């Protein structure tokens, strides 16, 4: 009876030990992941600085270093999303509805019934004849 209880106990404990081992090995510690990300960012920053130094002959290397460190920090703060970015219109839809876009009114002001463009509407409608031609001296 003692041997049977030991095997029963071993069959219960072995999967738990295997699960704990997998958890410890496969799941990274948050401190390790942040240090890895920082080291990757530093490596990218050094590569960018070396590339910028080779391409440009600027005496102000400190200014280049500070701008690149800001760029590196922003790259590390990038948020990972699950899909592509949806393009947004420049004018929001709500604002577009509130704006007065009467194309018919502007066409009526610019063109007569025959499609001729009317220029210089300071004098009113009597300045033009029925065909859209300007009247002079009448």
UniProtKB/Swiss-Prot annotation:
Predominant cellular place of this UniProt entry's protein: secreted
Q: Does the keyword Transmembrane apply?
A: no
Localisation per UniProt entry: Secreted
MF-aspect GO terms: hormone activity
Please name the GO terms of the biological process aspect recorded for this protein, alphabetically. neuropeptide signaling pathway; smooth muscle contraction
Q: Which family does it belong to?
A: Belongs to the gastrin/cholecystokinin family.
InterPro entries per the UniProt record, alphabetical: Gastrin/cholecystokinin_CS, Sulfakinin
Quick one: signal sequence residues?
1-33
Q: What does this protein do?
A: Drosulfakinin-0 (DSK 0) plays diverse biological roles including regulating gut muscle contraction in adults but not in larvae.
Lineage of the source organism?
Eukaryota, Metazoa, Ecdysozoa, Arthropoda, Hexapoda
- Name under which the protein is recorded: Drosulfakinins
Q: Which organism is it from?
A: Drosophila teissieri
Q: Which Pfam families does UniProt cross-reference here?
A: Sulfakinin (PF08257)
